[in-house]
């Protein structure tokens, strides 16, 4: 049967047949389509000569009826910042009711009580649903590294006469039903540039090119046989192939040719556009489109979308938004254009606009209170305030680490392989060090090495010779501490990513840039002329030998010994004393071990840093040997 025949069969399941025109009006089909469909239904024995359903016809409807639902609620909901810092997206309230509870209630209204919720991020928040609504909770432990195709694959065996529902959809009207005549995927009539499909005349969902706009994808779907079986098979096969780890579950709605290989998974979005056909995927979904009115469905994917739907939602009143309004003397509805910033190993930051300007709100990541003293950070910002080293924070809270800074347009970071960039960065670093600023706290390298090691909870290092490596560096400690130093406020995290080149807006900014450019090296590339330079991210700063900053720059850049020597020579203008070079070599080794220990701690939390972590440990060994060689050559004894 085709979908027209199934729609008519469902209509006759509930309503008595009167004539073709009334049936055409109630289904939205043409009289011609209705006539052809009625003839076929009669020929198949599904309706009698009076247009009433036979028992066979009723059985056909009953066997296609919904049996269960799966709600996908495992992801971070990254775009929901700052609400997602404390509440999973599925539990955001609209009209005082959590989104997922509204969905469950609407399913219950249609008699669907077999409901599975796939959770991951803040999974404990969903536990109450098991008692209150009798749902089955399935946990996706890989929610941070895999997309929702994996979530649905975990419950693939449950997909048969099943609604698949995203957790972030608010439905004004109940979209679920006690009967569903065929499989479908829901889209609206709204034209959406982010969509990957459009509805054709046959009500098929065909893929479109990147330059085209399609029908807005609501994301709700219904799967009955035979399509449910195809999706089950696709999910299992794709989930076993890591090439699909980042895919949305909608990828499983595309049939593949028999010769297609698993390498055909190059696309990373639903539908994945027309190139999938070339890679062995069909150019259309296996499901029919169910086109609905966009006014009845709202995807709540951002803070502002929630505010547009329910300006009184309790979840709009977050600590971070309150801090913004207080610091900038603005109202909640004046905070706009909120978007997440993914940069930063320890912070969860977001960009926003208010009163005609752009800002960044820094929200410290989970567990960073163990690693960073926010009161000390605030002391550092007070010490450097007004000195032109960085934009002064608009707001900083030493209790929770919240920080608001102005957003810089046209920014680039230092290229560690660009000699002009390196000259300017070392000039800036030397300028900062020459200020001889002070604070009341120090950055203790060996203290930090031991601190990160203590966070391993008694577990040994993953490196077999860790103890020997550490002992070697400890043996050099008395020597390096005996050397003369001019301790002052030191950045500690003076790495290429924290040197920001930018072009300021306005006449005053242009004048400042011109002044700084004039004082820079004469052979500065013309493309870089007019750029200002500042240092950012002062979280680790404290009193220390300023030459530690040179070491930190080297190890983050993954420099070899020759490149390290070049940077040292740039900082000292080619006049570095051998003893000072030895000292910096030792700092490179010590700081390498420090960040290696940091990486080991993060690894135990499930975070991997690839080559970076191994290279840090190599610095501890290689530059210990380099320092010893130079010490012997210079007649220095440890």
What are these regions (language model features)?
Residues 205, 254, 278, 286-392, ...:
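Conserved NTP-binding catalytic cores of kinases and kinase-like/nucleotidyltransferase enzymes
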Residues 9-15, 20-22, 26-27, 53, ...:
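N-terminal glycine-rich phosphate-binding loop and ensuing alpha1 helix
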Residues 340-446, 460-468, 482:
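ATP-binding pocket architecture of kinase catalytic cores
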Residues 310, 315-318, 597-638:
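ATP/Mg2+ or Mg2+-diphosphate-binding catalytic cores
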Residues 547-576, 590-607:
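Active-site activation/catalytic loop segments of kinase-like enzymes and analogous catalytic loops
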Residues 319-334, 437-492, 496-504:
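An alpha-helical support segment within catalytic cores of ATP-dependent transferases
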Residues 7, 172-253, 259, 267-275:
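Conserved core of the sugar-phosphate nucleotidyltransferase
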Residues 126-196:
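Conserved beta-loop-beta/alpha segment of the NTase-like Rossmann-fold superfamily
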């Amino acid at each position: 049967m085709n979908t027209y025949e199934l729609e008519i069969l469902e209509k006759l399941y509930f309503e008595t047949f009167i004539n073709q025109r009334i049936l055409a009006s109630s289904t939205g089909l043409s009289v011609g389509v209705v006539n052809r469909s009625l003839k076929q239904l009669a020929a198949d024995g599904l309706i009698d000569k009076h247009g009433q359903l036979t028992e066979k016809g009723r059985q056909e409807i009953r066997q296609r009826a919904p049996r269960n639902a799966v709600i996908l609620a495992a992801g971070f909901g990254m775009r929901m910042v700052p609400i997602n810092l404390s509440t999973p997206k599925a539990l955001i309230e609209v009209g005082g009711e959590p989104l997922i509870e509204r969905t469950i209630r609407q399913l219950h209204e249609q008699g669907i009580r077999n409901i599975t919720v796939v959770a991951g991020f803040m999974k404990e928040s969903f536990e109450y649903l098991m008692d209150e609504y009798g749902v089955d909770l399935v946990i996706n432990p890989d929610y941070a590294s895999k997309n929702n195709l994996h979530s649905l694959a975990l419950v693939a065996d449950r997909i048969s006469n099943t609604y698949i529902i995203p957790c972030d959809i608010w439905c004004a009207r109940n979209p679920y039903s006690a009967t569903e005549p065929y499989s479908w995927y829901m889209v609206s009539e709204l034209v959406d540039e982010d969509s990957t499909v459009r509805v054709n005349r046959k009500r098929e969902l065909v893929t479109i090119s990147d330059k085209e706009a399609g029908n807005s994808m609501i994301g709700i779907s219904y799967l009955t046989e035979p399509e449910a079986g195809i999706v089950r098979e696709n999910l299992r096969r794709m989930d076993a192939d890591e090439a699909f780890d980042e895919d949305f579950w909608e990828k499983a709605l595309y049939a593949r040719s028999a010769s297609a290989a698993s390498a055909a998974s190059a696309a990373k979005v639903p539908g994945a556009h027309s190139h999938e056909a070339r890679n062995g995927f069909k150019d259309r979904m296996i499901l029919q489109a169910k086109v609905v009115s966009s006014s009845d469905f709202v995807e709540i994917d951002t803070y502002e979308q929630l505010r547009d739907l329910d300006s009184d939602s309790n979840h709009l009143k977050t600590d971070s938004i309150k801090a913004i309004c207080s610091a900038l003397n603005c109202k909640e509805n004046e905070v706009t254009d909120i978007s997440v910033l993914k940069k930063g190993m320890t912070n969860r930051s977001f960009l926003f606009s208010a009163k005609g300007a752009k800002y960044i709100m820094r929200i410290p990541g989970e567990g960073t209170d163990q690693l960073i003293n926010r009161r000390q950070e605030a002391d550092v910002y007070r010490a450097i305030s007004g000195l032109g080293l960085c934009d002064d924070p608009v707001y900083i809270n030493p209790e929770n680490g919240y920080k608001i800074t102005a957003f810089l347009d046209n920014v680039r970071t230092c290229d560690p392989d660009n000699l002009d960039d390196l000259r300017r960065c070392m000039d800036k670093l030397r300028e900062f060090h020459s200020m001889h600023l002070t604070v009341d706290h120090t950055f203790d390298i060996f203290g930090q090495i031991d601190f990160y090691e203590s966070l391993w909870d008694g577990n040994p290092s993953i490196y077999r010779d860790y103890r020997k490596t550490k002992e070697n560096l400890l043996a050099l400690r008395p020597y390096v501490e005996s050397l003369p130093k001019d301790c002052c406020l030191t950045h500690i995290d003076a790495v290429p990513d924290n040197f920001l080149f930018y072009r300021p807006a306005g006449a005053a900014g242009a004048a400042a840039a011109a002044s700084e450019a004039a004082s820079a090296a004469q052979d500065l590339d013309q493309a870089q002329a007019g750029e200002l330079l500042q240092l950012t991210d002062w979280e680790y700063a404290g009193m220390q030998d300023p030459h530690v900053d040179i070491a930190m720059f080297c190890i983050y850049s993954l420099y070899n010994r020759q490149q390290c020597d070049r940077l040292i020579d740039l900082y000292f203008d080619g006049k570095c004393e051998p003893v000072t070079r030895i000292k910096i070599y030792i700092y490179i080794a010590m700081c390498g071990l420090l960040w290696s220990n940091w990486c080991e701690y993060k690894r135990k939390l499930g975070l991997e840093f690839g080559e970076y972590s191994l290279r840090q440990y190599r610095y501890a060994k290689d530059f210990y040997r380099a320092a010893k060689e130079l010490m012997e050559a210079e007649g220095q004894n440890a």
